[in-house]
Amino acid sequence: MALIVSKFGGTSVASPERIKNVAKRLIAMKQEGNDVVAVVSAMGKTTDELVGLAAALNDHPSKREMDMLLSTGEQVSMSLLAMAIQALGYNSISFTGWQAGITTDDVFSSAKIEDINADRIRGALDTGAIVVVAATD
């Protein structure tokens, strides 16, 4: 059994129909006997919309608050994809990067990964789940 990690950008998850298509692709990988992890970005133009909202409120928002705001786009995508997989009859769980065991430095807006503790992801895979992780690019 192989471990397959696939990254899906904003265009791939830009609409409910596209999310369903991604879910079907991931399920096909699972049906081939693989452990499957998907990493997803925010839907379509979500990041641009969030940046616009921030700009409407503050000409110079802090990098920390921008990181917090922008991470919500990925959280929406990860949850919707897990729901789509579940609707097709398969076990799925979503994680933020932090929940998945990814630790970064504290350089806001350009953090680097310092450590990955894959125990939580491995535990979910061991239950047969398709794991969906929010990207933090």
Where are the language model's segments positioned?
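Nucleotide/pyrophosphate-binding catalytic subdomain
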Residues: 1-137
